[in-house]
Amino acid sequence: KLYKMKKFLAILFVGVLFSALNFNNSEANTLTIKKNRVIKTKGDVFYKWPHNWKFSYIMEHWKPYAIQEITDNVRYGKTALRFELRSGSCGKTAGSDDCKNGPFGSERYELLPNNNDKDITFKGNVWHTISWYIEKFNTPLAGHNSIWQIHNDGDWAPMFNTDLMFDGLYWQRRTACNVPDIYKKYNAKGNDGCSVSWKENANVKIMDRNEIFDKWNDVIMNVNYTSKDNGFLKMWINGKLVYHYQGPVKPPNKGKGWSNNSTMQFGIYRMAEDGVHPHTQINYYDEIRYAKKKCSKLKLEQLGYSCEKLESQKIEVDTLFN
């Protein structure tokens, strides 16, 4: 009887321990998502951000591991977001099918502005930040791989996006694709016919490969969101000014289908030229902060930066007509 009792207690202990572990795993993720794709977080990933976020695909493509709010790898504070994109994870958005994007499709787990019920756009002089951490991976395939973008919700070209290449991280500017006097020369308009290779666009390397993986990287941006020539974008990475653009940022507003509502979106968006990416990619994001006009409102001293030192830096300016 004593042996049976010990055996029973041992089995009971293992069962309780297993249940506790499962409970902790399920409780570790504090992100929830509604049927309308809108997410809700409980932690401190976002600071003063002016709008909510929604998942990039329709809900039939949602996976519990796709985007989680976690506590075990954070840049600052208590929580960060963990994105996990597995091979073959293409899907449908509200108006398109990434599985039919190119010969092998594209894959996208991103967070977009929640514009289900209202227009969302940034206007004028804005400061915003995003910190990211990418687990190291290797892929034999060429293509594109975006970490975050400055985008619009019309058919215009994305104005700015990152591209993670084999040798490092590139910042791609396509603002020329949204300027009528320029895109008409190429018999193009917006995303239709746009190419980063146009002489009026730019593709600038901003980080070497050995600076990217398995560490937190902090991005600070100061953007004047306007379609006028006095627009600009300055970007610092880990406290160093790496890019400065002067010129229109937002596209013109051409009405239905050609809205120029523009903000930041982030997550994993990738496409390979000669196959489907074979690897699982894991990105973390944290410290997504927003302020109007003044750097000081971002409280960057919490992350170890001085607005005065940031704003004193200079770099060659990129324009439409360099």
What residue ranges belong to the model's regions?
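Low-complexity, Ser/Thr/Pro/Gly-rich disordered linker/stalk regions
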Residues: 28-322
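Sec/Tat signal peptide C-region and signal peptidase I cleavage site
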Residues: 22-28
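Intrinsically disordered, low-complexity segments enriched in polar/charged small residues
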Residues: 11-12, 87
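Positively charged n-region of N-terminal signal peptides that target proteins for export
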Residues: 1-8
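Bacterial N-terminal signal peptides
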Residues: 12-20
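N-terminal leader/targeting segments
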Residues: 1, 15-16, 319
